[in-house]
Amino acid sequence: MRRRAVFAPALLLAGIGLAGCAALNTVYADLSTWGDWPAGRAPGSYAFDRLPSQQSDPAAADRVEAAAKRALTAAGFRPAGADEKPDVLVQVASRTTRTGADPWDDPLWWRGGFGLRRHVWAGSVWVMPGPFDRTRYERQVAVLLRDAASGRPLYEARAANEGSTLGSDSLQAALFSAALIDFPRVGPNPRTVRVALP
């Protein structure tokens, strides 16, 4: 009996800790999809199709395409071979927009304020507290699938999320996974989806 009383709280804390770790690897994204993927058509082979603006910075385009490859594979696509004509041309794009809100944007709800504060380490000092660095980053990826033979757009997806950090390549890959999570279905736009970081 005493042994159970000791292990039960430990197991509970371990479970809470594992749930917390799983939450750190989850990305929520707002997803919008459009298109008319032909019924019964398999995903097939693909090749990336770069716009002229993307060709001016090949290293950046390579990073975006590398982030999208895992999502395309999960959706059932495979890269076209060197001598193979692709079934689908894929255009991918990614952008991050930084915005910074001023602390006085909304004076009725401003968290700052002047006042006399007592600090143990400094005594009484005048301070202006508050979270003044409220930088937000909106990250967005887009995928456009075109029929290689006709050039007709078949499927378009956009996934976006925002946070207080710039993000990373793995976050970008997760956003591409979110963009193609429902492929080939289109759904109510926008909708929130959840994916794991790779």
Task: Name these PLM-found stretches.
Residues 50-60, 76-78, 131, 159-166:
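Second-shell loop/turn segments in exported
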Residues 92-150, 186:
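Surface-exposed short loop/turn segments
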Residues 42-44, 75, 86-88, 137-142, ...:
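Envelope-exposed proteins and targeting segments
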